[in-house]
Amino acid sequence: MPKRAADEPGTSTTDPFHEQSPFDAVLAGTETTDTICEEPPAKRIDLDIKQEFNGGVQSGGLIKNESELTQMTIKQETEGNINEARREEEDEEQDEDSRTSMPPALGEDDDYEEDDADSFIDKTNTPPPSQSFLEGCRAANLPNDIVTGAWETYNHAVQRVSLEGSESAWQLSAIYYYLLSKGIKRRGKTIRILIQPFPVSILTIANSFDISVAEMLDKTARFVEIIHSRKIRRYQEYIRRIQEGLAVSCVIFKKFCRIFCKIFEEIKVGSENCPSSHELFTVLWTSFLVMKSRMTVDDLISNYQLLFSILDQVYTEMCSMKEGIVHHLNQKFVEDLLENDCTIIRALCTQFGGSVLDARHFSDHTFKKMEKTGIPSTWNFQEFRDLIMNVPKTAYENYLLQRGSIDERIFIPSVEDFSKIFQSPDTYSVADILKVSYSGRRFRDAEFLTKISNNHCLEKLALGGKVASEKLVTQSKEQPRVPCVEYNLELGNYPDDLESNNQSLYNRLTKIIGSWKLENSKLEEVCGTMSDSPMATILLKSDEMTNKFERTLSAELGETINENIPKYHYNVRKELELVFLIFMEKIIVAELKKKVREEDLLNVIRREEFLDSVFCFCVELILVSNGYDRPFPWSAELCGVHPFMFHKVIDLMITHEKQLSRQMVQHFSRIEETVIEYFSWKSDSPLWPMVVRCPFAHFQEFGEDWADKLNSYSPIKFTPIKKPDDLRDELGRPIVPQNQTSRTLRIFLKRTYFTAARRLQDLTDRVSMGARAKSQCWSLFDYLLRNDTLIFMDRHLDQILLCCVFVIMKINESSMLFTEIMAQYRRQSANSLLVYRSVTVFQEQLNPENPQAVNTKETILERLEGPQKEKTTVDIIKYYNIEFRDRIKYIIGQIDSASDEDLMEMPVATESGLMPVRVYLTHKLSIQTLPKTKHGESKQERAIANLEKSGITIAMERSGD
């Protein structure tokens, strides 16, 4: 593979920032001030929002001399950079000022803008960098602080997941991520120039690590998801733009090769007043890249027209010259233009597939008004050869450092291989250059990723056009989509039909049971070593529930219970009994290995609610493995456990049984999602008494970090150490300890946010909602969930989301009807007919003679303890008109007038979601307790202190972790 002309290893576009070795501090174990964050700033506590809401110039003329051009270029480039930097600083100051006055339900945390890559990494046990990492950094001349910070970021990712593939590629992606984290703002408008430019071109670093561009971008995109910081959306958008820009440049470069061979003749060796073909090709392509960087859009058509405009300008000036570069012109091409009396733009559009009218319009109204600094304004090589060659190069290299982009001069072949452009321009492979490293090593997964990308693009072309063109969406226009057949990674085949799928599930169940017997089992052994063996309690529960399961199943099938019970039902009962005992064994053994106190563990095991939940899980496992058509919550009703309490053990069971198949895990994930979206909000749910004691408004915002430590319910936290009967309030009602309640609610709230974010992101994309409208929609949902939680009682999560989408569309003056939004909702995989046809309301609200308005000041406790009112169901449009609209009258005005910085950005829900992650004791993973954050006095604390000085006492609750 020939060497590329651009950016060889060890060549930096700027001088190093220091003279000493950049690895001395790393090897010595010291830390730089730029990468240390001793204590994160205090997080605010959410308040009720109602308490806060009371009141280019074109450069003309030719170059006269070398010094004039140099001074002009440096001055204009410097002034442009300074002005843009000042604008970014002003945006930062406005962001900081707005935080003091923004509504808590709408804004972000009251912390400053931290360096994203430094704010969440535990640096106490970071091992020293590997030798290969240091060698790559040394070859790229990276500053010491970047070497240290990038290695800490890489080590943080290694501790979280197992990184497969080239270690050097992941280390390079960590460097790229760290450099972007220094330059990308978390808030405010999306920037085109980084706050802190790169010290070295990223292509130089990639060549130093011998990694291809395609592999670097692929690994960086995945690295962003692994870290999953608060700025993940900004990172993904930035990398997406870089990838799209490269894709456009690939197409344009291949077209440019054909055009260059058509207009110019090959001159292998240049002279003082006439460059070689390789030099002319390099200057033209670099000039195009400089102008391309100033385009507000980066689509293929606009770049195509930009290329035509540049060639038109160059050709026009060359024709006016008698010596020098004019010798490059292809005489046959010139004669054809003169013979047909045709302009070069018309000729290029005719021969290479462009629109003459669009190209002329772009040239007259866009290109001629663009700033021309950074590209040659004369092509007199005899007088200004060095400047013509260096000015575009310098301008483009400054752009690369300011934006962190890939050097697209990588496509230019070396001098030795340049003759291939003239020999076979159509067969010159551009995309392959991105797949090969500096030494010629090919990216193994490049072809596979290309196929996936092509299929994704074709799907977007097939479906995306309808959303933009069709304003009215009707059910008759929807085309049924054939679902893809899922390849079974565990069995190595495709499921032929439902029967074979059920058979594979049953085989997996048989594998879980194996030859397990109670006699001489670990369960019997461990229980025997306890001071008060729980074996009798477990066996009694097993016998009681299996009998109930058998009776219920037989009664539904119309059979009588006698000695002639079918053998099949008997086998199912035995399977259920064994599965229950196996899971109890795994739970007890695993918890004892964690050094859990025996007293705490016995309290959990003897709790009826816990045993019923575990048995309910086993019933679901038996039903799905044997192909029984008993949709959830049939198993919960059988076991007498509420779905909200049952979903708390799902993570526990999946974590302790590693032999569950993918289909089994997906089945329980769907059940958990059903509980979160509907069953938890029923009026009889245990969730409501917990919310009364610890409202959602007391919890801090999660941002976009779905992967913090509180993702799973702990078995020990399932019950307090003291029995519930021992803790009662003044009215005799049982009190759930605050630490347990807050932990349970925090995990549930996080999962609710994740589910809502995923549904809302899909729905808002389908209705073509803009970025500001999405933030408004998420801000409204967040306010309702935290400050008006009662609106969710007896309702489906999607019902609230649909209403939020409709009202935001209305305040943004959209003409889309509610029925059209419902049509888009029906396209979601998790849609339900009952969502928009059966919304619970009170019967008194529908009284035609005297309809009762909704009481927006009613509390959850008043609803629970008050007299039960008659309920009925209506369609979602009627519900919106009689209740939802009245509940949001106040907040919607604040959201409508709020600035973009005051609105909450919709978080990104990763594909893996909150799926339980199995972590075993054999894993090389160190879990350390972080020191407690020292919070400063918040606004709420200061307000309460002022009230207490006036003689008013207010009790403030904090949510526990």
Swiss-Prot record:
Entry-linked Pfam families: DUF3452, RB_A, RB_B
Keyword DNA-binding: yes
Major site of localization recorded for this protein: nucleus
Entry's Gene Ontology molecular function annotations: RNA polymerase II transcription regulatory region sequence-specific DNA binding
Chain positions found as Phosphoserine: S714
Membership in a protein family: Belongs to the retinoblastoma protein (RB) family.
Protein name in UniProt: Retinoblastoma-like protein homolog lin-35
Lineage: Eukaryota, Metazoa, Ecdysozoa, Nematoda, Chromadorea
